[in-house]
């Protein structure tokens, strides 16, 4: 019974089904060994009985034949039969114990099967990993089948045999898991390679399709962009032309403190039409102007004045030549309008700053290069105000029909500080002199030329525009200034150039075939701004002082003469890229409303 209890304890120590199976297999092997041993003992007992029977038969023969006097050895046979019966009894008892053990094993196997889901098999494997590694070699040497041992051999202790077989089962199971994982890894690797190849093929096809689609899309987009830019330019140009390629503004200077004593201004704006001015005095001299494009009131600030003239600068951005010049007699406020003091800069600096702002708004599509040059026409000689060593420059005409001045210094500007410094440097070099009309009278025509080169990064087209900002010398009569000597010579040169400017305007008004641009340096320089599709704005300055009555009337006459000119477009030869657009939205442009002319 102790052996039976030990077998039950072995089954109870099993925690997993595979351990129960191993124990069951080993018990079966032990049963076989026990049966073999029992059969061997039975065979030996039978041999002993046979020997005893043979001896007994021999004794009986001897006794019958008279060779022996008595018959013996009965006790030996009974002893053999007793031993054989005892062995059979032992065999039956062994079978009973084995049956009980098998029944108990089935119960334990069922319990372990129910508990298997709650056990952490991986934890048990990890805790025994080192022990398996140490006993692997010895486990592998355990024979897979147990052959019957001779009766005299020593059988390995049962617990040690169970432990060896348990470890061998663990090792085989781990090997199978490792082989399965390796197989799955190889399959996943092949699947990954196949997926990668398929993905690369798909991406290549997608890339080709996207490249084709993108190329077509951008081609259509650029074509539409060019068409829209051309249409916008045409509309803007038509609007400017409707207002007149040459436009005329009047600006009436405010009265000075010395002019307000018991004196009414001789120049006033018509109460019914703000595009008409009246020039009159108490003696009956009177002049009423024809309708101008705009009359700037005396209370307008420098900022308000620039807001009125800024739309024409858009044409310069689009590649047209633009000229804004101030006309009037000495003391009427021309230089104040164009230059202005440091605290209230005039049109020159504000116009260049507007170009910077426009360039900044469109830096994504347009690359701009802005250069500034300053010159004066003094006694019909062109002097470079930024390089005083250039005192007598010549005018040349390019193959495209543009006027060019070789040797004129052009300074690239990139900030407001550079613009201010450049204009101040040129301003201090211009020619001035004291006359009876003004203590610091400009004795030359001062021209600030701004060159705007714009390259469209999308269309690769280039636009070149010129902005001429002209402060004309005083238009007063020689008799009023009482000039003599050098001042007289300067006044005669000034009046001659202004007269030739009037002749050019008259020829344009009459659509003459020959326009006398070459009669003076001023008209030659301004030829691009007066001819073809260029845009010109003339600000005629009038003084409310009674002493300047005749000069104001003369200025009004000049304004009426040039205000009736309508230039013919398309007479200039231009590069194909001249029409490329740099683009300004309609919301950013302010157009100057035209007033009806009388």
From Swiss-Prot:
Residues 19-66, 89-118, 170-248 form a coiled coil. It comes from the Eukaryota. The keyword Protease does not apply. Keywords: ATP-binding, Coiled coil, Cytoplasm, Cytoskeleton, Microtubule, Motor protein, Nucleotide-binding. Residues 133-155, 569-598 are annotated as: Disordered. Its main location: cytoplasm. One of its GO terms (molecular function) is microtubule motor activity. Pfam families: Kinesin (PF00225). One of its GO terms (biological process) is microtubule-based movement. Belongs to the TRAFAC class myosin-kinesin ATPase superfamily. Kinesin family. This is Kinesin-like protein klp-3. It comes from Caenorhabditis elegans. The lineage of its organism: Eukaryota, Metazoa, Ecdysozoa, Nematoda, Chromadorea. The gene is klp-3.
